[in-house]
Amino acid sequence: MRRILSILVFAIMLAGCSSNASTEKQHAGGEKTVKAEPQSTSSQKDSTDDYQPNSQVTDDRTLHKVGQTFSDDKGKAVLKDIKQVNKTYKIGDVELTVKEMKLIHLRPDYSMIDYFHELTHDEEFDFVKVFVDIKNTSTKKVNVAPIALMKTNTGETFDWNKDIYLEELNGELEGGAEKSGNLGFIVNASSGHAHDKAADAEKKTKEIKWIEITTSDVFDHNHKKISDAQKIKIKF
């Protein structure tokens, strides 16, 4: 139900993002690659303090070194790669801080299999997790999504409704308000179709070396676009 509600509430914002992408060929405006501003050391320490346990995905707060594992009632997670990013990107009046990026191998508990079957038929899989903070620096309400699209070096592209965390980071943000949370996307997953086995095997041999995030456009309370979507590339 949460996924359905997210789709309904956020449809207008995605339409704006898609429209912006289609007009990119006509002019040099639209999506831009933004320059990051590094955070202070104190801000970096806040990344785990801001974390809120998720009802679908295994807690990864203790995973700081490649090879470390953690198990809970939602499954078993193994850390495959990690990048402390701690950079802030400005999208008009919105500040998006990417705090941390992880590549995690997850074997969900049996009780969670049905949830993940919407996205993959694999019993275990890798996913890229991005921990972000998003802040509205203006006094007026805006609508924005920190990740409307995500692309990897392997050629896969995901839109926002493939997010496995569902922490309601997309949508309205009141003036001066701030949200923190996770977004995660299953990568190199098998399709579940026999004729795609060769392609699935090839994808699994590819390492995730970088991701490219495209935010949504920023809209005001009347759903009028006030800032263009931005592209952010992050390497492991």
From Swiss-Prot:
S-S pairs: none
Annotated segments matching region Disordered: 22-62
Keywords, ordered alphabetically: Signal
Lineage, broadest ranks: Bacteria, Bacillati, Bacillota, Bacilli, Bacillales
Signal peptide as annotated in the record: 1-23
Gene: ydhF
Top-rank taxon: Bacteria
Pfam families: DUF4352, LPAM_1
Protein name per UniProt: Uncharacterized protein YdhF
Ranges of compositional bias, category Basic and acidic residues: 24-35
